[in-house]
Amino acid sequence: MRSYRDLLGRRRLQLLDRLGGNRGWLRELSEYYRGLTIQEFWVRYTLGRMDAATLWERKPRSTEADYRSFYAETDYFVLRQMYYHRNDCHHDIARTLRRAGREGDFCEYGCGVAPITAWLRSRFPAWRYTLVDLPTPMLEFARWRFRKFTNVEVKEPGFGSDLPLTRSYDVITCLDVLEHVVNPLQVVLHVVEHLKPGGALYVNFIEAPGGENLVEAAAQRMDTIKLLNDSLEAIVPLRADVTAEVNAHYVKPRR
C-alpha cells in the first residue's frame, strides 16, 4: 500500500525513464563499475539474472550460513535493485520524518543497496542514518554510495540472536526482509525494542515459502504479525490471513 503522492511521483519518473531521463541510477553504477554503459548494464544484468535463477539450487542450503551465503555469491542483486528501485518515491516515509523534526534517527533494516536512504538523505541532511544488512555485494555498494557522508553508518547482523542495533530510532523500515531470515520473530522484537516512543515502523512480510523465501520464516509469520499488532499501534496493519505484500505502518506507543 503506497500513498497517492508516492504513486504520482513514480508515474512521473516512469515517464522520464521512457523519455531517456531519470538516469541517476545508471550514473552511480557507471562510477562504481568504472564506466559501465547502458549496453554493458543490460548484458551483465541478463547474464546475471540467468545465473542467479539457478544459484540457489547449486548447493545444499539448510543452515543460516548457507542461506546467507546465497546473497554473497553474485553481484547481480546490485544491478537488479538499482534498476528495480529507480522510479521509487518515499513521500509517505518522508512525511513521518518531517513530523519527527529537523533532526532524528532513521534505520533501513535489510537495506540492500539502500534505496530509501538514498532518497531521504538529501531531503533530510541533518538526520542520522543506519544501514543494516548482511555482508554482501549489495551492502558494499551501499557503503560505497554513502562513503562521503559521516551521518550514515553501516551495521551487519551476526548469526541468530546477534542483532546489530544499539540505539533508538524515530523511524525504521524493514521492507522485503522478514521472509528471507530464519528468525523473523526475533528480528521484529529487536526492531520494536529499538524504536523510540512515538517512533514509526514500516514493515512487510509476504507468505510465499520456497527458495530464498525461507520456510523457517513462513513458520514464524503468524506469531511475528501477532507481536507487531500486540506491541504497536497499527496505522496500516499486517494480517496473517493476507499473504500478498502489504507495506504496513506501525507506531510505538508513548506510554
Placement of each model-derived feature along the sequence:
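A conserved beta-strand element that flanks and buttresses the S-adenosyl-L-methionine
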Residues: 173
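Conserved N-terminal segment of class I S-adenosyl-L-methionine
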Residues: 1-167, 188, 204-205, 211-253
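Hydrophobic adenine-recognition pocket in adenosine-nucleotide-binding enzymes
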Residues: 177
